[in-house]
């Protein structure tokens, strides 16, 4: 089995942002994405939207961008088009890592053969996927660099998840987790942490075995939290919960872009990239999902630990010169703003605590999406 990796001559960036629709009265999810897609396609053909797994969701997709600000500007225009169409239909755009109370039985899956296969195979867990995320693609010049960079990126898994965590509630309950989306998504058999392959050939051999055993026939592809996107010549980082505003998304995109390019440059210099033991990576994923920005994480193969907030500050300091070169210095600095203000999961909890209802958390996310920045519930 051959997998052709379409090499990217530059470390370009692309972003996919999953946005759902809610009823403004009930605040429940509304399975009317097809209507929004139709209106936007007719009025704004330059905007790239995709249908998604759920009939309540549209995905905003940028083109191939040179900088984070360019990608964010494209998402801003796409979001405005979605807002316009949704308002006309009597709906509100909303997004977060998960919806706090919607029932999966009331949220139909989109009509697509591969989606039907996933549900047929995964049953209860497949039906539970009322979750939304951000996917960041960064261009890679050669397939031999892909897995060394991915193996380094998983050392930063908790950093990206803690910053973006925005799914504390499920089925009307506070789960105690900052990112319940993370715990849900890994229930699918092809999702979760990537294996730490040592070469592109190992990856190709693995995919051949997945094909031979029928796994890919059922699912269409592997859905790892970080994976190669061979068709585009990118590494796709799928760790982040969907942020409910564009300002926080831009911080996630900037940190991701800088990390990938940082590790790529380390290869250029002949330096050894950082790695952790597989159990370290799994433990860090759980800690960030559970505690968010208050997580204590493992930072070395010797099992040394540090607070994720402190590690994020050190990362921003280390990556600042590179961010200036990549044109995303302002966006990278927003990482520090998230640390100081607190994450989306914290704002949702505060909204619930003030009102006694998760409806307030839905309203808050809708308002943030409209205002493009973090807010606090009144």
Curated annotation (Swiss-Prot):
HAMAP family assigned: Glu_cys_ligase_2
Function: ATP-dependent carboxylate-amine ligase which exhibits weak glutamate--cysteine ligase activity.
Keyword Nucleotide-binding assigned: yes
EC numbers: 6.3.2.2
Molecular function in Gene Ontology: ATP binding; glutamate-cysteine ligase activity
Domain of life: Bacteria
EC supergroup of this enzyme: ligase
GO BP field: modified amino acid biosynthetic process
Keyword field: ATP-binding, Ligase, Nucleotide-binding
Protein name per the record: Putative glutamate--cysteine ligase 2-1
Family the UniProt entry places it in: Belongs to the glutamate--cysteine ligase type 2 family. YbdK subfamily.
Catalytic reactions on record: L-cysteine + L-glutamate + ATP = gamma-L-glutamyl-L-cysteine + ADP + phosphate + H(+)
